[in-house]
């Protein structure tokens, strides 16, 4: 059974810059003007990452544009946003990202079937330059293979 997801924003660079070892879903605490702006698709999570502050996890550098029709009650575009996770999940995440070289990266932001905003997070390890070159070579080779198959 496939889940309904209306994708708002994706972080395509994360798949190039990191090895994604584990994926998880988290809710996010938002203000009303932020939700309205997300419904218009005005969000970017290209540079966003998550970090722990004690017993909580926050999403940093997530840009949600201001909602034009909200007057003085508008939100700050790049404020830290709290992620909603179970305590066991938070402890597991903190244990994993405290290891050197690991980070918590936002992969996508979407509305689920109940119209709640969710963030897909990935526990990731950074790629070295030669790893990035290898992934480019693999992608080019797959593209060439598909061209050769189509020509036959």
Curated annotation (Swiss-Prot):
Main location: cytoplasm
GO biological-process terms attached to the record: trans-translation
GO-annotated cellular components: cytosol
InterPro entries assigned: SmpB (IPR023620), SsrA-bd_prot (IPR000037)
Subcellular location: Cytoplasm
Keyword DNA repair: no
UniProt entry keywords in alphabetical sequence: Cytoplasm, RNA-binding
Molecular functions per Gene Ontology: RNA binding
Alphabetical list of SUPFAM superfamilies matching this protein: Small protein B (SmpB)
Signal peptide: none
Top-level taxon of origin: Bacteria
Function (record text): Required for rescue of stalled ribosomes mediated by trans-translation. Binds to transfer-messenger RNA (tmRNA), required for stable association of tmRNA with ribosomes. tmRNA and SmpB together mimic tRNA shape, replacing the anticodon stem-loop with SmpB. tmRNA is encoded by the ssrA gene; the 2 termini fold to resemble tRNA(Ala) and it encodes a 'tag peptide', a short internal open reading frame. During trans-translation Ala-aminoacylated tmRNA acts like a tRNA, entering the A-site of stalled ribosomes, displacing the stalled mRNA.
Family recorded in the similarity comment: Belongs to the SmpB family.
Protein's name in the database: SsrA-binding protein
Species of provenance: Rickettsia rickettsii (strain Sheila Smith)
């Amino acid at each position: 059974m496939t889940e309904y997801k209306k994708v708002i924003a994706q972080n395509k660079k994360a798949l190039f810059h990191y090895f994604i070892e584990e994926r998880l879903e988290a809710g996010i605490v938002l203000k009303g003007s932020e939700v309205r702006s997300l419904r218009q698709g005005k969000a970017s999570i290209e540079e966003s990452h998550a970090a722990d502050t004690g017993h909580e996890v926050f999403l940093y550098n997530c840009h949600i544009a201001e909602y034009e029709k909200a007057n003085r009650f508008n939100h700050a575009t790049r404020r830290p946003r709290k992620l909603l996770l179970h305590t066991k999940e938070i402890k597991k995440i903190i244990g994993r990202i405290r290891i050197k070289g690991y980070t918590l990266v936002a992969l996508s932001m979407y509305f689920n079937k109940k119209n709640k905003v969710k963030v897909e997070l990935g526990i990731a390890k950074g790629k070295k330059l030669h790893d990035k070159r290898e992934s480019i070579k693999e992608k080019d080779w797959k593209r060439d293979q598909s061209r050769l198959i189509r020509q036959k």
